[in-house]
């Protein structure tokens, strides 16, 4: 049995003690301080974990006037990264984050699936859940895996939505395109990382924070199904597209739908930061 959406702290502890083909990834990241995750990892991490940096491992080159702030890397580049982590065809990958468990972890989950690896799960509740349960942390450097695994990418482009499709369906009824940033970002308020404020014209709001309970773990599949059934309004899950500021946190909604037994939702990787590079694309507050 593999874990393909979420894994609890106790399940991860058991996995570490009973299985050998397991790769743990630390994806901690802070938008205001991109070096913070690297420093936090060096100070303390789950034993055996390796670093998965949003800035260097999980993002490709920015093309001015074309891409958003966090484009996916080329599949061949990410394949090499996955191999360097020691991931093979049957490896169970577990990824964790801080700050209620989700900043970049859900993006890693989606990227692993995009490149063809299903045995990947996010630590439910993130590092706070692991630490509050009393499980160990270490500052010891993790030895690089040897030999490098022979993971071969099998890209699934259907897991993502491109800008042309988003532009085509954004005014559909019922709503198909949803902004994951929360009410402030949706309405162009609060702190912004892009020069234009607002949201894609016609998009609905699907605040990613609503997928979590007060303790930072995901709501139950039953609760999430009710939540997403209201958003879908009778549509198939595969009709739904989520975006955010730069294609990172929107993956949390995709993961939550999968956890709820509603597979097929997609993420628009370019998100708001790509949408606004073309002044002819419509926006609203």
Give, region by region, the residue ranges found by the protein language model.
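Cytosolic catalytic domains that perform sulfur/thiol-centered chemistry
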Residues: 1-285
């Amino acid at each position: 049995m593999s874990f393909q959406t979420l894994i609890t702290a106790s399940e991860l502890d058991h996995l570490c003690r009973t299985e050998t083909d397991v790769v743990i990834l630390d994806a901690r990241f802070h938008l205001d301080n991109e070096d913070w995750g690297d420093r936090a990892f060096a100070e303390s991490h789950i034993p055996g974990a390796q670093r998965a940096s949003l800035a260097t491992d999980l993002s490709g080159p920015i093309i001015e006037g074309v891409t958003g702030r966090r484009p996916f890397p080329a599949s061949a580049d990410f394949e090499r990264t996955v191999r360097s982590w020691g991931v093979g065809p049957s490896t169970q990958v577990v990824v964790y984050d801080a700050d209620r468990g989700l900043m970049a972890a859900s993006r890693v989950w989606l990227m692993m699936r995009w490149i063809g690896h299903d045995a990947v799960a996010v630590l439910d509740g993130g590092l706070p859940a692991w630490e509050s349960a009393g499980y160990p942390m270490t500052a010891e450097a993790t030895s690089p895996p040897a030999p490098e695994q022979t993971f071969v990418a099998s890209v699934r482009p259907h897991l993502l939505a491109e800008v042309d499709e988003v532009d085509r369906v954004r005014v559909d009824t019922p709503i198909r395109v949803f902004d994951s940033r929360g009410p402030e970002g949706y309405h162009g308020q609060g702190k912004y990382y892009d020069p234009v404020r607002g949201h894609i014209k016609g998009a609905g709001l699907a605040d990613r924070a609503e997928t979590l309970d007060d303790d930072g773990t995901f709501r139950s599949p039953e609760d999430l199904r009710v939540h997403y059934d209201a958003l879908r309004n009778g549509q198939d899950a595969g009709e739904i597209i989520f975006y955010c500021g730069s294609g990172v946190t929107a993956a949390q909604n995709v993961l939550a739908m999968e956890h709820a037994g509603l597979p097929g939702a997609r993420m628009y990787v370019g998100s708001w930061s790509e949408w606004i590079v073309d002044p002819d694309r419509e926006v609203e507050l």
